[in-house]
Amino acid sequence: MKFSSVLKQSAKYAAHVPKSGVFPRGFQVGSIASGVKKNGNLDLGVLVNTNKSYESSAASVFTTNKFKAAPVILSQRVLEEKNGKGINAIVVNSGCANSVTGEVGLQDATQMAKLIDEKLGATSPSTLIMSTGVIGQRLQMDKISKGVSQLFANNSFGSDFNSWLNIAKSICTTDTFPKLITSNFTLKNGTQYTLTGMAKGAGMICPNMATLLGFIVTDLPIESKALSKMLKFATDRSFNCISVDGDMSTNDTINMIANGAVKTDEITEDSPEFLQVRDQVTQFAQKLAQLVVRDGEGATKFVTVKVQNSSTFADAKIIAESISNSMLVKTALYGKDANWGRILCAIGYAKLDNLDSLQTDKLNVSFVATDNSEPRELKLLVNGVPQLNIDEERASQILALPDLEVLVDLGTGNEEAQFWTCDLSHEYVTINGDYRS
């Protein structure tokens, strides 16, 4: 199954792709089919900050995979050298990951960024790089260079809806729909601002950054250290709380740029608006991350795993992750099998920081319907005791829903965490069995 047909035929496209939007001031985006992708789809995108009245701030969260791709290594260097200030562009390609490509890969990534810097007249490196696609293949820099030249020569940049939608399309690989969201927010002091985000990912998705590329931009002025803290907090509760298949990629990157086009006081960690913006960014990032799971390769279900009343947030998250990554749980969900023993097993082998977080005689596990049908909650385990007379018909009804929740109550504290995952189907094997072709 080829991506070109997947994108056109996807029923998810109509359900999750916006038809309009308002975008942050002071940004322009462009995209082009450079030829890196064999199918002729858009595969090169550039985002540019055009606001010169404020020195932009940038922050990133990168993969923890030991085999970091060249664009990850180079972007980390640029951010460190610039202390998160003066980053004015992001260039991204799909079709080739430029990963495990050695010194020549770093040279290609450097050249890719330099192409943009030169077009913008930058006197020092100010471009972040992102790549996604097949690992171990060298980037076709002749095509990238020609594509960049055409983008700028034809002035193929815009701030309209179609321009933003097309750059979201340009980063897709096995995705069945481009992931683009934009929202307006109002601070308590009356300041209005906008967040726009896009992401790609449908497979090789597992926390601590998987095959997941994304960026969020805003027209708020945010100090670089405050922005970094916001993004880390948001990522820990969004992009690091999703799982499709448990595989961690070499390229994951989430970038965020604040260009200060909104005329208001710069937000720092000490600003009264800091927590409000941080929480708004977190909720926004969660919506964007959830789209990745909804587009999980071959997925038929979107599943929220909620772990509540834990002694710590960390342990609640560890348990939610363990359940979300379990292949046996995911296949049971696909088969509509109310096999709660698999959930219990995944809870039991979770590598907790604090063993007191899990006490078997306080544990409760339920399936929860999300369509407002009753009974909404079907209890499977109560205070460690299995419910022997489970309504199997009701269980089948809940498990047949496209959206459902697995609820775990530890009864040992007041902290909670959520993970978002999907089922594992035959189609996942089909997609990944011929990915390179």
Swiss-Prot record:
<keyword id="KW-0511">Multifunctional enzyme</keyword>
<keyword id="KW-0808">Transferase</keyword>
<comment type="subunit">
    <text>Heterodimer of an alpha and a beta chain.</text>
</comment>
<feature type="binding site">
    <location>
        <position position="432"/>
    </location>
    <ligand>
        <name>substrate</name>
    </ligand>
</feature>
<keyword id="KW-0012">Acyltransferase</keyword>
<comment type="pathway">
    <text>Amino-acid biosynthesis; L-arginine biosynthesis; L-ornithine and N-acetyl-L-glutamate from L-glutamate and N(2)-acetyl-L-ornithine (cyclic): step 1/1.</text>
</comment>
<dbReference type="InterPro" id="IPR002813">
    <property type="entry name" value="Arg_biosynth_ArgJ"/>
</dbReference>
<feature type="active site" description="Nucleophile">
    <location>
        <position position="211"/>
    </location>
</feature>
<keyword id="KW-0496">Mitochondrion</keyword>
<dbReference type="InterPro" id="IPR042195">
    <property type="entry name" value="ArgJ_beta_C"/>
</dbReference>
<keyword id="KW-0055">Arginine biosynthesis</keyword>
<feature type="binding site">
    <location>
        <position position="437"/>
    </location>
    <ligand>
        <name>substrate</name>
    </ligand>
</feature>
<dbReference type="GO" id="GO:0004042">
    <property type="term" value="F:L-glutamate N-acetyltransferase activity"/>
</dbReference>
<comment type="function">
    <text>Catalyzes two activities which are involved in the cyclic version of arginine biosynthesis: the synthesis of acetylglutamate from glutamate and acetyl-CoA, and of ornithine by transacetylation between acetylornithine and glutamate.</text>
</comment>
<comment type="pathway">
    <text>Amino-acid biosynthesis; L-arginine biosynthesis; N(2)-acetyl-L-ornithine from L-glutamate: step 1/4.</text>
</comment>
<dbReference type="Pfam" id="PF01960">
    <property type="entry name" value="ArgJ"/>
</dbReference>
<dbReference type="GO" id="GO:0006526">
    <property type="term" value="P:L-arginine biosynthetic process"/>
</dbReference>
<dbReference type="GO" id="GO:0004358">
    <property type="term" value="F:glutamate N-acetyltransferase activity"/>
</dbReference>
<comment type="similarity">
    <text>Belongs to the ArgJ family.</text>
</comment>
<dbReference type="InterPro" id="IPR016117">
    <property type="entry name" value="ArgJ-like_dom_sf"/>
</dbReference>
<feature type="site" description="Cleavage; by autolysis">
    <location>
        <begin position="210"/>
        <end position="211"/>
    </location>
</feature>
<protein>
    <recommendedName>
        <fullName>Arginine biosynthesis bifunctional protein ArgJ, mitochondrial</fullName>
        <ecNumber>2.3.1.35</ecNumber>
        <ecNumber>2.3.1.1</ecNumber>
    </recommendedName>
</protein>
<dbReference type="GO" id="GO:0006592">
    <property type="term" value="P:ornithine biosynthetic process"/>
</dbReference>
<keyword id="KW-0028">Amino-acid biosynthesis</keyword>
<dbReference type="GO" id="GO:0005759">
    <property type="term" value="C:mitochondrial matrix"/>
</dbReference>
<feature type="binding site">
    <location>
        <position position="200"/>
    </location>
    <ligand>
        <name>substrate</name>
    </ligand>
</feature>
<feature type="site" description="Involved in the stabilization of negative charge on the oxyanion by the formation of the oxyanion hole">
    <location>
        <position position="133"/>
    </location>
</feature>
<keyword id="KW-0068">Autocatalytic cleavage</keyword>
<feature type="binding site">
    <location>
        <position position="173"/>
    </location>
    <ligand>
        <name>substrate</name>
    </ligand>
</feature>
<feature type="binding site">
    <location>
        <position position="211"/>
    </location>
    <ligand>
        <name>substrate</name>
    </ligand>
</feature>
<feature type="binding site">
    <location>
        <position position="297"/>
    </location>
    <ligand>
        <name>substrate</name>
    </ligand>
</feature>
<feature type="site" description="Involved in the stabilization of negative charge on the oxyanion by the formation of the oxyanion hole">
    <location>
        <position position="132"/>
    </location>
</feature>
